[in-house]
Design a protein with these regions (language model features):
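Short, charged recognition helix plus adjacent turn
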Residues: 68-78
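A short, Lys/Arg-rich alpha-helix, primarily the initiator
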Residues: 1-19
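DNA major-groove recognition helix of helix-turn-helix/homeodomain DNA-binding modules
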Residues: 51-66
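Short alpha-helical DNA-recognition segment
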Residues: 21-40, 55
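Short, conserved catalytic or interaction motifs in soluble domains
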Residues: 43
């Protein structure tokens, strides 16, 4: 099993959230969480539970793989 880099994960979530123009509170509300939970992800204090990965990725406009790898994957246009 691969270890998730909490720092990279948090920075990626924060970047994606800001690109979408939503606050921590708005993201938390859409996931039925507190804004403190989102803050903890973004400050590398914790990572979301596995059951939140799909809805989180959907809200941030990335795949679960991209979310876990903390980077966008190249798109093939072929």
């Amino acid at each position: 099993m691969t270890h998730i880099d909490k720092q990279a994960f948090g920075a990626f979530v924060a970047t994606l959230r800001k690109e979408k123009g939503i606050t921590q509170k708005e993201l938390a509300e859409r996931l039925f969480l507190s804004d403190k939970a989102v803050s903890k992800w973004e400050t590398a204090a914790s990572v979301p539970s596995i059951d939140l990965l799909i809805p989180l990725a959907d809200l941030l406009g990335v795949t679960v793989t991209e979310l876990l790898m903390c980077r966008r994957m190249e798109q093939d246009n072929a």
